[in-house]
Amino acid sequence: MTEHSIRNFSINFGPQHPAAHGVLRLVLELDGEIVERVDPHIGLLHRGTEKLIEVKTYLQATPYFDRLDYVAPMNQEHAFCLAVEKLLGIEVPRRAKLIRTLFCEIGRLLSHLLNVTTQAMDVGALTPPLWGFEEREKLMIFYERASGARLHANYFRPGGVHQDLPPGLIDDIEAFCDPFLQVVDDLDALVIGNRIFKQRNVDIGIVTVDAAMAWGFSGVMLRGSGIPWDLRRAQPYEAYEEMEFDVPVGKNGDTYDRQVIRMEEMRQSVRIMKQCLAKLRAPDGQGPVTTQDGKVAPPSRREMKRSMEALIHHFKLYTEGFHVPAGEVYAAVEAPKGEFGVYLVADGTNKPYRCKIRAPGFAHLQAMDWMCRGHMLADVSCILGTLDIVFGEVDR
């Protein structure tokens, strides 16, 4: 019998694949049904964000961050605002801190709802995304009532937030919380307890503690392996040090553990939201929502009607922008997908000299080849879904 050289089979996964979660192209090398190699091709959504920020003022640069992880926009703005505030050395009013914390947790719900339900859809369950999007719609309306926009909010500004919450919004968010917990329980029973979902996800894409550290993972990818690292707890920012919440961690580091953690994080987010709402109602939660420094934040409309100086401040702020002292700073937040960091270099002018964006999805996607080797072709979409990738932030 003559020997035949067996050649591996290469296929393209994407860029328009329904399970690719964006414009991802994977070149898969298969031996039968077993994945031998995965070659991710990124950059199909590259828009040159970091370079664009260098020619915009600090205020004009803020909306670019909404367009990175567009599933939870305000969490990205948060990191940039923290970086600018560190360089300016300004203190954010307490009410603004509470509003920021509240909307960051709403962003976490938006992201986790989308991820858990669409990953269930990749596995074959069609009901969860329909339930999840119904809840996301309510949260989008809260975004819209606070900022005027459902998606690209541009609500967080250096020095605070753009405007105070409209009357009645705090009551409506509070009315949303308890029924939402019931929806989370229903999703938990439908997805996490599902026999088929378990068969598709348990012991798939296992990440050990050492591997998670070596690949530079953060967020749920790190906690799924049993490392209790959460920036909200480890390096508290804004009002998180006042909040009581638990950090759920996994045991096995597989795709199933990561989805269980995301479900539990939604419950913890609601817990934080309730505390924020109570503090916003308290007497010490009242007051301004942006810094009173006229060089950084615009004056009130009332001031502008009366004062020539306020009008000049307003004009200079929106034409030239504020000048940030020369220096460099790294600010990171616990975004829903992991540690989202902004390394900002200022040269004393009104524009950033350099703004490096550290996207968690980028670090997670680089391990795709390592995680998929030896798995079946059908497991690739399970692993990709649990990485929680959004291409706005990967390609930037």
UniProtKB/Swiss-Prot annotation:
InterPro entries in the cross-refs: NADH_Q_OxRdtase_suD (IPR001135), NADH_UbQ_OxRdtase_49kDa_CS (IPR014029), NDH1_su_D/H (IPR022885), NiFe-Hase_large (IPR029014)
Catalytic activity field: a quinone + NADH + 5 H(+)(in) = a quinol + NAD(+) + 4 H(+)(out)
Keywords, in A-Z order:
Cell inner membrane, Cell membrane, Membrane, NAD, Quinone, Translocase, Transport, Ubiquinone
GO CC, alphabetical: plasma membrane
Instruction: Give a Pfam family name.
Output: Complex1_49kDa
EC numbers:
7.1.1.-
The record, for SUPFAM superfamilies, names: HydB/Nqo4-like (SSF56762)
GO terms, molecular function:
NAD binding; NADH:ubiquinone reductase (non-electrogenic) activity; quinone binding
Protein's membrane topology = Peripheral membrane protein
| Annotated localization | Cell inner membrane
Reply yes or no: does the keyword Cell membrane apply: yes
Give the record's subunit note.
Answer: NDH-1 is composed of 14 different subunits. Subunits NuoB, C, D, E, F, and G constitute the peripheral sector of the complex.
Q: Which PANTHER family match?
A: NADH DEHYDROGENASE [UBIQUINONE] IRON-SULFUR PROTEIN 2, MITOCHONDRIAL, NADH-UBIQUINONE OXIDOREDUCTASE 49 KDA SUBUNIT
Q: Provide the function of this protein.
A: NDH-1 shuttles electrons from NADH, via FMN and iron-sulfur (Fe-S) centers, to quinones in the respiratory chain. The immediate electron acceptor for the enzyme in this species is believed to be ubiquinone. Couples the redox reaction to proton translocation (for every two electrons transferred, four hydrogen ions are translocated across the cytoplasmic membrane), and thus conserves the redox energy in a proton gradient.
**Recorded family membership:** Belongs to the complex I 49 kDa subunit family.
Q: What name appears for this protein in its UniProt entry?
A: NADH-quinone oxidoreductase subunit D
Gene this protein is translated from: nuoD
